[in-house]
């Protein structure tokens, strides 16, 4: 829409995307680190205010520079929102951190899935000014987040009154070197997951149209099925990690998707869609488990860790889109699909993650151990 209206070059479109990626991904770990040291209960509402102003500017922007300002503000809103939201989700989890993280993330996944649909139904028919209509949703979100900020402020007061011994402490005894190694492995896993998902979300429709002659509308329905399955997988991954252990969910999610991903580019049209749904369902269950596993490694740095991995998610998604687009221009859509399907095989390195017993599975083992000890004493 913006390219057609303003006659932007592909380079200018790329710069707009880059500004959004820079502000929404690179800033997140630093904002999360600041929030860990100086919690701000109303930062969630403040972040949504950035988004609100960005949407309003974007709806009336007359040229390139105002559009850059608008997308930069929207990206900053995302950077402020995600790290603190993860902390609030874990505070409200009642110990079921995986479930809470999944519920939080599925909201974002649902919004991402609805984005193309809303663009087709609202923005394209009614033009640039219709972007301002979404400001109403941002205003509603600010009101809700202000109420959440009130609750968060109360929780911070309660936490501040606890003795120093009650401060967050890791449930493991890993050294700094092993923690850094584990975080590095998680980073590689996020790379494999989101580079692969970038190839699917951006080029799956072209793959279906080029190879099978499926219509544009039909290919969009197939992409929506993949994104819908991804949302379901996101919901399932968190509570499953609470029950059986996050390491096993991460392992099964990324490596478990590999066989279906490898078969996808060789299947027929119906088989390709069915396999895409399976891949979306399986591979999307990993991220909430990855975030909670990482925050269990460093429980006093929830904001920084959440910001780091959400930043990686956005940043790698953008890099993956650009890389596979560059590769597709020089080869073919089918070739990039065959290359990208190798990425889930990196899930095998999950085996090098240390075992951390937290959540329900860890608590259950603790209770069993206590019961056994009690019986032996009797």
Can you name each region flagged by the protein language model?
Residues 42-57, 248-262, 341:
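Structural signature of the two symmetry-related core transmembrane helices
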Residues 241-290:
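C-terminal transmembrane helical hairpin of 12-TM major facilitator-type secondary transporters
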Residues 21-29, 112-113, 227-235, 317-318:
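Residue-level signature of mid-helix packing/kink "hotspots" within the transmembrane helices
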Residues 26-64:
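Conserved MFS/SLC helix-loop-helix module at the cytosolic interface between two early adjacent transmembrane helices
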Residues 27-39, 234-245, 328-329:
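Helix-to-loop junctions at the C-terminal end of transmembrane segments
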């Amino acid at each position: 829409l913006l390219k057609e209206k303003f006659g932007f070059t592909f380079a200018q479109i790329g710069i707009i995307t880059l500004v959004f990626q820079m502000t929404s991904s690179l800033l997140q770990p630093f904002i999360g680190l600041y929030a860990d040291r100086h919690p701000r209960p109303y930062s969630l509402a403040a972040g949504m205010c950035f988004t609100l102003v960005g949407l309003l500017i974007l709806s009336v922007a007359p040229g390139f520079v105002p559009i850059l300002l608008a997308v930069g503000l929207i990206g900053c809103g995302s950077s402020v929102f995600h790290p603190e939201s993860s902390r609030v989700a874990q505070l409200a989890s009642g110990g079921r951190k995986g479930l809470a993280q999944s519920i939080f993330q599925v909201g974002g996944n649902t919004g991402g899935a609805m984005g193309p649909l809303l663009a087709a139904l609202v923005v394209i028919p009614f033009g640039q000014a219709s972007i301002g209509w979404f400001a109403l949703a941002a205003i509603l979100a600010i009101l809700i987040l202000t109420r959440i900020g009130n609750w968060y402020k109360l929780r911070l007061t309660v936490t501040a009154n606890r003795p120093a011994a009650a401060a967050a402490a890791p449930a493991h005894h890993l050294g700094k070197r092993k923690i850094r190694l584990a975080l590095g492995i998680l980073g590689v896993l996020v790379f494999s997951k989101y580079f692969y998902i970038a190839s699917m979300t951006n080029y799956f429709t072209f793959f279906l149209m080029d190879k099978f002659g499926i219509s544009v509308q039909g290919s969009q329905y197939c992409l929506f099925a993949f994104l819908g399955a991804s949302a379901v997988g996101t919901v399932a991954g968190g509570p499953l990690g609470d029950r059986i252990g996050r390491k096993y969910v991460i392992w099964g999610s990324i490596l478990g998707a590999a066989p279906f991903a490898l078969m996808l580019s060789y299947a027929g049209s119906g088989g390709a869609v069915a396999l895409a749904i399976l891949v979306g369902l399986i591979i999307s269950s990993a991220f909430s488990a990855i975030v909670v596993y990482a925050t269990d490694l460093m429980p006093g740095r929830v904001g920084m860790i959440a910001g780091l991995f959400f930043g990686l998610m956005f940043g790698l998604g953008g890099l993956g889109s650009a890389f596979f687009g560059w590769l597709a221009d020089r080869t073919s859509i089918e070739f990039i699909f065959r290359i990208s399907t190798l990425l889930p095989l990196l899930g095998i390195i999950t085996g090098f993650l240390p075992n951390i017993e937290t959540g329900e599975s860890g608590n259950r083992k603790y209770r069993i151990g206590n019961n056994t000890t009690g019986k032996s004493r009797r």
